[in-house]
Amino acid sequence: MVLDFGARAQDFLKRITTLSADLAAHGRTRALALQKLHRLCQAEVRRLKTRYTLATVKLALSKYRNAIRAVEPDHLVLRPRKMRSGQRFSYLALEPEETRSLNAAYHERIHRDQSNLIPLDPEAFIQTALELLASDRYLQKGMGLMALTGRRPAEIFFSASFSLPKKKLPYPAVIFDGQLKTRQAPGTSFEPYPIPVLADPKKLIQALDRLRSLKSFPSPEAVNTTTGPQLPKYVSAAFGSLELPWKPGHLRSAYGAICCHKFKPKNQTDDIFLAQILGHKLLGPNASLSVGQSYKDFYISKV
């Protein structure tokens, strides 16, 4: 099931907006407004926890913060606070021990996955992706673009735009604009950047234009709600097998593995190159290398 927290986030935003004037005041008025804001946030987090797993709640709270940030980038909800005990907390986040538990589970999964990599035949992968690209069914064409450019579903179906580089690069490339999941953190960049591609760049630009004419979406959430239930079975049918079923995220991982194999400069590690081509470099140095660990699912088995 694909969950869309956009509407709930907007409803929560309306509820805390009524406090804006008092939060901008001074003295007792501001103190009381801060207390009410804290109670509203705590109640919303508790409500989410009764319905969803911690991982899903963490995702939902990220949606809430993004909705607030889009309207008021400096809202107090977004600022870390300090208790009298000295402990730091956020109005709209999980408890520190809950976050640590999720992070531990994440690192355990990464260790397990990287201890059992999936073999990948680059030529077979690219050929399958090109066949999908030639389809006039929007989901198949989108899968082809995802595989050949390494972009996420919501980027391919909604936010991405491709253009040709002005200068020749050492690999086939397009300039990609429309990166999602940048976390909107301090130091984050939103600039378009070059990405290597696994097919003719002009062909990919034309395919993206054709895809948008086949079907358009109003938002990333609409993409995830519509394509989320279908993509796993279609991706696995096209690229996986009964023994090794594929997930949509594997397309991005396979793209990264092939690009490292074909295009990575010899004086760079895989981590640095992946951070560049997957857009993790935009997150800033603290997050860029760690995020790339989620995309190391394959090893090149044939050349």
PLM features per residue range, with description:
Residues 196-255, 260:
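Active-site/catalytic core of tyrosine-dependent DNA strand-transfer enzymes
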